[in-house]
Amino acid sequence: MYATEAGGFAPEVEAELRKMEACDLMIWQFPLWWFGLPGILKGWADRVFAMGRTYGGERFYENGVFKGKRALLSLTTGGPEAVYQRGGRNGDIHAILRPIQRGILRFTGWDVLKPNIVYAPVRISDEQRQASLNAWAERLRGIEKERPVEVGEY
């Protein structure tokens, strides 16, 4: 809060804040790591999503600082899709992503788009990998037409 009030963010944090404020669409590309964000991305979020600047007071969810901006998660997993289903060994992937999609992104006002998930890319064939990349490229070409998804409640 002090950095927000005093304008005292470290230059690299201020630069990241300005990037978020300027963008229309933010994409986080990462491997799912211990059912969450990799440490470096979690650390980035902890530093950059600063109280007073990106949320606070009545500025959250539909009244959030980033209202009207869109965000999506693009991630890879270590296991196949079957283990990330409700009742699967690792649980429902959407429940796993909820703390990120709702607790960080939607909380600060972002409209969250459907995540792009590639399951176990190290275990799929070159043809499957290429098909996944092609589908992602095609999706990105039409991303401006996508509607936000409901990220669920706790």
Question: Would you name each region that the model predicts?
Answer:
Residues 7-101:
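Helix-loop-strand module that forms the ligand-binding subsite of alpha/beta enzymes
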